[in-house]
Amino acid sequence: GFLNGREAALHMTKRQRGTIIFTGATASVRGGAGFAAFSSAKQGLRAVAQSMARELGPQNIHVAHVIIDAAVDTQWIRDNFPDYEQRKKVDGIVNPSDLAANYVTLYEQPRNAWTFELDIRPWEEKW
């Protein structure tokens, strides 16, 4: 996270524009039993994004953090979620193109209305 963001920022600061989007998970804002390593890494990434947003915003670089609290429709999900078909029928699995549309929206935001953090989850997800 940090190294990728730093390298992207080096190129963007020369151009005085750009967008860096970090992807997190529910663990970015809430720890859970058995998830200490994952949660600490995701919370750390969120802190990196916050710091970079404050540092790079004045240089016209939009830094955002996206929390994905969902199963995204991939082959791995299809193979490993026994209730995949049922969840898919009721919009309980996120479609990758819908996820991508949210990233494009972040990218296209005008500077006077930048979003720092976006939570994406299906309607049925418990939070």
Task: Name these PLM-found stretches.
Residues 1-14:
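Amphipathic alpha-helical dimer-interface segment in Rossmann-like NAD(P)H-dependent oxidoreductases
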Residues 9, 53, 104-107:
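Generic structural signal for well-ordered alpha-helical scaffold segments
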Residues 13-14, 28, 57, 111:
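Residue-level signal for alpha-helix termini/capping positions
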Residues 19-44, 49-50, 54-58, 72:
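Catalytic loop of short-chain dehydrogenase/reductase
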Residues 34, 61, 65-80:
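Short beta-loop-alpha junction of Rossmann-like oxidoreductase domains
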Residues 58-61, 65-70, 85-127:
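C-terminal helical subdomain
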